[in-house]
Amino acid sequence: MFRGATLVNLDSKGRLAVPTRYREMLNEGSQGQMVCTIDLHQPCLLLYPLPEWEIIEQKLSRLSSMNPAERRVQRLLLGHASECQMDNAGRILLANTLRQQASLSKQVMLVGQFNKFELWDEQTWYQQVREDIDEERSSKQPLSERLQDLSL
């Protein structure tokens, strides 16, 4: 399971160094093989260990290519999917097209989200966190049943 938000640097070649605490888990679970794609709803990238991505691919394969909305999701997620191999130094090369899509600069937030990571431009991440907190504090919407049952 991946959790926490860590500031990492992209080098001049577009590689990011995976924090040490995740490297062993990624090497054991996927031999360092990962897949990166865009997020459909946020200005970030999604980085999956290969076995987790294969589950997503199976779900995507069950969507109908005849349904325009389902085809669009397939096109966006699969069309932007890029395989990444963690090297011996624990670095992952992110495709330039993906870095541009998420407006990633030198400073990137690597955010654990259970079975995957989100990759955010640092400033965009902090802005999103502020917006999310403000939204939660001012929301007049009733909580969903699942959130009502969540005890922290």
From Swiss-Prot:
**Which superkingdom, per the lineage?**
Bacteria
Task: Describe the location of the SpoVT-AbrB domain by residue ranges.
Answer: 5-52, 81-124
Q: What is the lineage of its organism?
A: Bacteria, Pseudomonadati, Pseudomonadota, Gammaproteobacteria, Enterobacterales
Could you tell me where this protein is found in the cell?
Answer: Cytoplasm, Nucleoid
Question: What organism, scientifically named, is this protein from?
Answer: Erwinia tasmaniensis (strain DSM 17950 / CFBP 7177 / CIP 109463 / NCPPB 4357 / Et1/99)
Name of the gene encoding the protein in the UniProt record: mraZ
A molecular function GO annotation: transcription cis-regulatory region binding
GO CC annotations on file: cytoplasm; nucleoid
Alphabetized PANTHER family for the sequence: TRANSCRIPTIONAL REGULATOR MRAZ (PTHR34701:SF1)
Entry's Gene Ontology BP terms: negative regulation of DNA-templated transcription initiation
Pfam families from the UniProt entry = MraZ
| Job of this protein | Negatively regulates its own expression and that of the subsequent genes in the proximal part of the division and cell wall (dcw) gene cluster. Acts by binding directly to DNA. May also regulate the expression of genes outside the dcw cluster.
Q: In which family does this protein belong, per the annotation?
A: Belongs to the MraZ family.
Under the subunit heading, UniProt states: Forms oligomers.
Q: Which InterPro entries match?
A: MraZ, MraZ_C, MraZ_dom, MraZ_N, MraZ_sf, SpoVT-AbrB_dom, SpoVT-AbrB_sf
Listed A to Z, the keywords are: Cytoplasm, DNA-binding, Repeat, Repressor, Transcription, Transcription regulation
Q: What is this protein's name? A: Transcriptional regulator MraZ
